[in-house]
From Swiss-Prot:
Catalyzes the NADPH-dependent reduction of 7-cyano-7-deazaguanine (preQ0) to 7-aminomethyl-7-deazaguanine (preQ1). Gene3D superfamilies: 3.30.1130.10. This is NADPH-dependent 7-cyano-7-deazaguanine reductase. Its EC number is 1.7.1.13. Substrate binds at V88, E89, S90, H228, E229.
Length: 281
């Protein structure tokens, strides 16, 4: 259990509770979660964050009505800057998107502007929204994370409780720049404890990281309860603390739930995330 799992800021969330689905636009359905909940225990201050980054959401189930009442569909991408005061709780995001279903909008741009305005208000920070028609997306190939996959190691694991100390002694003598990938990241929703499945890409320059120790550390998230964004910041913080790289970027792409996938990245260098969906997305 995290130190803030029962924090009062989480008590009012619809997540984990029976809710009615509304199909008429309602911005009040969006619910914020303060980023400070997990940052404070990690010693991360909003005015001195050791990283920059964003939470990239893909919206696969977005529909509304045009002025003639004809349903419209699009696929959207949302980028919420990591400097925002809040992250957006995912079930509330899903309920909010459902409220577009029977609402008329003048145009695709009107939908985009509405999404951007409401999400900025909820996150209290910079948000950008891009919408694409299906014909602009069809035929795009499934992407893959570049880098060396560390998953096929012949090691025994019997403990699946989170332990940052598994990274202790992981930094070697040799200085390298490399990209490591694992598809074995699995954590659990902070509230419902439903499993969240993800792939993670770690690019760094600095003391060479022991791949066995890194894999054991990533697998230890298996029983850990935290939101996607919080897990990525924890990974960034722990690798920084134990391995002290000169430069570090951590990027995770999670499988979708409720028509949404969440793909957070954090970096202290020059990093541009590839946004193509992976095989499990």
């Amino acid at each position: 259990m995290t130190s803030y799992e029962n924090h009062q800021a989480l008590h009012g969330l619809t997540l984990g509770k029976s809710t009615d689905y509304r199909d008429v636009y309602d911005a009040s359905l969006l619910q914020p979660v303060p980023r400070s909940l997990n940052r404070d225990p990690l010693g991360l201050r909003a005015d001195a964050l050791p990283f920059h980054g964003a939470d990239i959401w893909t919206m696969y189930e977005l529909s509304w009505l045009n002025r003639n009442g004809l349903p419209q569909v699009a696929i959207g991408q949302v980028e919420i800057n990591a400097t925002s005061v809040n992250l957006v709780e995912s079930k509330s995001f899903k309920l909010y998107l459902n409220s577009f279903n029977q609402t008329q909008f003048e145009s695709l741009e009107a939908v985009r502007e509405t999404l951007e305005r409401d999400l900025r208000a909820c996150a209290q920070g910079d948000v950008s929204v891009t919408l694409r028609r299906l014909e602009d997306v069809e035929g795009e190939p499934v992407a893959r994370f570049s880098g060396d996959c560390i998953d096929n190691q012949d090691i025994n694991i019997t403990d699946y409780e989170f332990d940052a100390a598994l990274l202790s002694g992981a930094a070697g003598e040799e200085t390298v720049e490399e990209t490591l990938v694992s598809h074995l990241l699995k954590s659990n929703c902070l509230i419902t404890h439903q499993p969240d499945w993800g792939s993670v890409q770690i690019h760094y320059r600095g003391p060479k990281i022991c791949r066995e120790k890194l894999l054991r550390y990533l697998v230890s998230f298996r029983h850990h309860n935290e939101f996607h964004e919080q897990c990525v910041e924890r990974i960034f913080n722990d690798i920084t603390r134990f391995c002290q790289p000169e430069q570090l970027s951590v990027y995770a792409r999670y499988t979708r739930r409720g028509g949404l996938d969440i793909n957070p990245w954090r970096s202290n260098g020059d990093f541009t995330p590839a946004t193509g969906r992976l095989a499990r997305q």
